[in-house]
Amino acid sequence: MVRESVLVMVGGALGSLARYWVGLGISQWAGAPPFLFGTLLVNLVGSFMLGGLFAWSVALRIDPALLLLAGTGFCGGFTTFSALSIECLVLLQKGDYPTAMGYLLGSLLGGLAAGWAGYLAAKAL
């Protein structure tokens, strides 16, 4: 139990740090806060990675410890449902309903598509 908890903690810390770096990169590249785009990017990339990890776990019988580190830990720390929720609420409070709905649908459908693409890509390797 302690070993597994440490694996999740280390993976989560690395995933959170990676998400922070993506946000910084988006801010520097776009010259604006990573609101919406940064969150969408990490959620889509994280869904792709988790889909691939799932495919490999089935095909290669990956050690459960690696799944805890990379899946629950890293992907869990890298992606962020809470930021998606708050960003949608901010858009709704501003009355920007089309952007809020587009962002929500794009995140959900894009996440499903990215997860499926990651799964298929990993199976093809």
From Swiss-Prot:
Compartments (UniProt record): Cell inner membrane
Reactions catalysed according to its record: fluoride(in) = fluoride(out)
GO cellular component: plasma membrane
Recorded GO MF terms: fluoride channel activity; fluoride transmembrane transporter activity; metal ion binding
Region forming the signal peptide: none
Binding site for Na(+): G76, T79
Main location: membrane
Record entry for activity regulation: Na(+) is not transported, but it plays an essential structural role and its presence is essential for fluoride channel function.
Annotated transmembrane regions: 6-26, 35-55, 66-86, 100-120
Keywords attached to this entry: Cell inner membrane, Cell membrane, Ion channel, Ion transport, Membrane, Metal-binding, Sodium, Transmembrane, Transmembrane helix, Transport
Topology of the protein relative to the lipid bilayer: Multi-pass membrane protein
Keyword Phosphoprotein: no
Family to which this protein belongs: Belongs to the fluoride channel Fluc/FEX (TC 1.A.43) family.
Protein purpose: Fluoride-specific ion channel. Important for reducing fluoride concentration in the cell, thus reducing its toxicity.
Protein's recorded name: Fluoride-specific ion channel FluC
Protein's organism: Gloeobacter violaceus (strain ATCC 29082 / PCC 7421)
Upper lineage: Bacteria, Bacillati, Cyanobacteriota, Cyanophyceae, Gloeobacterales
